[in-house]
């Protein structure tokens, strides 16, 4: 996240405390100052100072709480104030860019999906900035105070410095300084994250893994990867938070991957590779119901659910390959649950048992026997994943402090 700074010790304490108080108000509001002091384990004087600054900045508001059966003056509670604060959430995928204006509660104000061609003479960075400018121009009457920009996209990304080293599909991308360029252009902090990691954060904050402390989330789409929540926090390794299972070699003699290696899991389990294998198998078998119709993920899943042997075998094979890599991760992280986000989840009754069986066969029984395989709540489209980046920046205080000081 390029927008994060390295504050001094005292400033870091202030940032952390403010973020903790904001999180409690956001999650529990309306909540009293007394309860905030107890829950945040901060002195009442500290709570008073932090809350006063948030009230003056119109980030929180006071609300009378009338408790049932109580007499006398109502208690005063605090709630976040979100409608006057907006951020831009951007999602870049293969051939498309999603742009959405959301308020700080993550409520959608307006969203667009536009074409972003894979091969064009104009560099991708320049095209992204142009789309942002035009989006703001089109929707300037709806825009309240802009706080930040959140960007999620596939590729090999240095999230700390906002640099995209490589991207699938967009071959001209090499060391693209996306975060820095957009921050200089707009004047607001920019948070950039791999789409799978951001999606993992969104599920933890708003979705299927909310409340779980240890989770592995696997995405099987045009790209394959995983995010890990351990002890309630997204796992970070250096400047990356993505577990690159998609670039784990499963076949040294396999197809060349965009990362430069051969036989990566992504070249076998991504939906493009799955459809390619299905077409190859169809050319050798005339008995499948997939003949005589367009071959898509939907038609493949539908055929599998209707008992087509070829379709079932293809999807089971994906589950076995993914499960083999997940077994290693289960041994490392001992998760409570594994979330699967994939268009192939339309055949979850086939895919998920194949993944679970592979894990049970190859992981430690003590770890694998209680692990649950479930579907994600959200999909890999749209801009909800970016909402998690902004929410996290408010909770850790990095964005909150900037808003208080502006």
Label every PLM stretch briefly.
Residues 108, 164, 234-235:
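Hydrophobic "anchor" residues
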Residues 27-28, 170, 206, 221:
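Short helix-capping/turn signature of helix-turn-helix
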Residues 77, 87-91, 146-150, 215-219, ...:
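Short glycine-aspartate micro-motif
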């Amino acid at each position: 996240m390029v927008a994060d700074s390295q504050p001094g010790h005292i400033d870091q304490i202030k940032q952390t405390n403010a973020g903790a108080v904001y999180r409690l108000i956001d999650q529990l509001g309306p909540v009293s100052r007394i309860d905030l002091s107890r829950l945040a384990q901060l002195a009442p004087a500290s709570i008073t100072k932090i809350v006063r600054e948030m009230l003056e900045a119109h980030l929180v508001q006071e609300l009378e709480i009338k408790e049932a059966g109580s007499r006398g003056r109502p208690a005063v509670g605090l709630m976040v104030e979100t409608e006057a604060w907006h951020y831009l959430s951007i999602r870049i995928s293969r051939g498309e860019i999603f742009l959405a204006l959301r308020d700080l509660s993550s409520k959608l104000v307006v969203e667009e999906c536009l074409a972003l061609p894979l091969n064009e003479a104009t560099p991708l960075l320049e095209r992204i900035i142009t789309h942002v400018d035009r989006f703001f121009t089109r929707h300037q009457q709806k825009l309240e105070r802009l706080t930040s920009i959140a960007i999620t996209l596939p590729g090999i990304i240095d999230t700390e410095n906002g640099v995209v080293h490589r991207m699938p599909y967009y071959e001209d991308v090499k060391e693209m300084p996306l975060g820095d360029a957009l921050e200089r252009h707009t004047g607001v902090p920019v948070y950039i994250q791999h789409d799978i990691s951001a999606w993992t954060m969104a599920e933890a904050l708003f979705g299927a893994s909310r409340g779980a402390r240890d989770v592995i989330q696997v995405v099987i789409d045009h790209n394959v990867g995983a995010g890990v929540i351990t002890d309630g926090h997204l796992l970070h390794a250096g400047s990356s938070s993505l577990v690159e299972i998609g670039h784990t070699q499963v076949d040294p003699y396999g197809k060349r991957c965009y990362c430069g290696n051969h036989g990566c899991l992504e070249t076998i389990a991504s939906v493009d590779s799955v459809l390619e294998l299905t077409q190859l198998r169809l050319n050798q078998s005339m008995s499948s119901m997939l003949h005589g119709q367009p071959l898509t993920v939907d038609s493949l899943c539908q055929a599998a659910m209707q008992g087509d042997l070829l379709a079932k075998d293809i999807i089971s094979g994906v589950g076995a390959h993914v499960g083999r890599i997940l077994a290693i991760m289960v041994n490392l992280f001992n998760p409570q649950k594994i979330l699967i986000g994939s268009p192939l989840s339309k055949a979850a009754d086939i895919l998920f048992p194949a993944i679970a069986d592979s894990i049970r066969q190859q992981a430690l029984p003590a770890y694998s026997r209680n692990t649950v395989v479930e579907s994600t709540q959200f999909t890999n489209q749209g801009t909800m994943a970016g909402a998690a980046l902004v929410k996290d920046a408010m909770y850790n205080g990095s964005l909150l402090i900037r808003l208080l000081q502006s």
